[in-house]
């Protein structure tokens, strides 16, 4: 059954506010430990009012993940228009993606939600994002800016490293990321730049 919601500007805005609050709470507590009343508290709503916009807590989490993936889609679109080598594209993507609140939730998708209708869409989006990153890496190898090696293995190592850094530093926005941004950029250069390797 679909939630009872008409797409009026006021209700769309309230739904977006619930999503933003949910991103914050899920990021802090995880899907299983987060409570609906924690999500609605700052919005002066009752926990039951969420069901006016979402069918369940699981449905809300799915929509949270999709909203984060949409932000990544827009970022990828912007980066693809940049006239730079592919090492710079990967560095820019990393810098911008790390400031997205809730980014680590993409790596914490509970398997218990696999029966939800949009779960397959999330996995398809994830596969597409990985494919784009791998394409950048391969093109970087072709233009001479990236080192040789298996792009999928490099991606897995980088994303895993960034996942833990994101959690340790509680990165939520540009301000909190700015403190470690130089370290991340240097790390990517050390890992992937052919120019950096030649200077050693």
Question: Where in this protein do the model-derived segments appear?
Answer:
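Helix-turn-helix
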Residues: 2, 17, 25-59, 63
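Generic hydrophobic, amphipathic alpha-helix propensity
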Residues: 14-22, 39, 64-68, 72, ...
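Short coil/turn segments at alpha/beta junctions that flank glycine-rich nucleotide-binding fingerprints
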Residues: 28-32, 82, 143
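All-alpha amphipathic helical-bundle segments outside canonical DNA-binding/catalytic cores
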Residues: 87-91, 123-126, 142-159, 175-179
């Amino acid at each position: 059954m679909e939630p009872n919601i008409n797409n009026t500007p006021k209700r769309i805005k309230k739904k977006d506010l619930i999503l933003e609050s949910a991103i914050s709470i899920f990021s802090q507590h995880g899907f299983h430990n987060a409570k609906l009343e924690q999500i609605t508290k700052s919005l002066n709503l009752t926990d039951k009012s969420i069901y006016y916009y979402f069918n369940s807590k699981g449905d809300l989490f799915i929509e949270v993940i999709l909203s984060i993936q949409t932000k990544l889609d827009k970022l990828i679109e912007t980066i693809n228009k940049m006239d730079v080598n592919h090492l710079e594209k990967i560095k820019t993507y990393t810098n911008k993606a790390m400031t997205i609140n809730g980014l680590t939730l993409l790596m914490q998708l509970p398997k218990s939600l696999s029966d939800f209708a949009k779960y397959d869409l999330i996995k398809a989006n994830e596969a597409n994002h990985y494919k784009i990153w791998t394409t950048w890496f391969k093109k970087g190898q072709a233009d001479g800016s990236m080192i040789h090696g298996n792009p999928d293995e490099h991606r897995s190592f980088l994303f895993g490293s960034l996942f833990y850094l994101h959690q340790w530093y509680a990165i939520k926005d540009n301000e909190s990321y700015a403190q470690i941004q130089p370290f991340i950029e240097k790390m990517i250069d050390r890992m992937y730049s052919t120019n950096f390797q030649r200077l050693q």
